């Protein structure tokens, strides 16, 4: 009974630490597999934000970018909360209107 109590007591703490260490290791492995420097990742982030911002207004406080590895595949995860969709402006429709 005492051994069960000690096992439960210590397994909670080690499980929590174990999960944190596992998450850190996954993040490190994802960065290594993608072979991206922090500067390259930041450059990609800024470029993605620039392109997406042309079409929608983003909530900058809720944005998240991170690398994730699952099943040997590394993915860049971008969570971009959208406030509103911007009106679509196309050069084609303007030039057609001017010709008519």
From Swiss-Prot:
Protein name: Cell division topological specificity factor
GO BP term (any one): cell division
Alphabetical list of NCBIfam families matching this protein: minE
Cystine pairings recorded for this chain: none
UniProt record similarity statement: Belongs to the MinE family.
Its biological purpose: Prevents the cell division inhibition by proteins MinC and MinD at internal division sites while permitting inhibition at polar sites. This ensures cell division at the proper site by restricting the formation of a division septum at the midpoint of the long axis of the cell.
Encoding gene (name): minE
Native source organism of the sequence: Synechococcus sp. (strain JA-2-3B'a(2-13)) (Cyanobacteria bacterium Yellowstone B-Prime)
Key words of the record: Cell cycle, Cell division
A Pfam family matched in the record: MinE
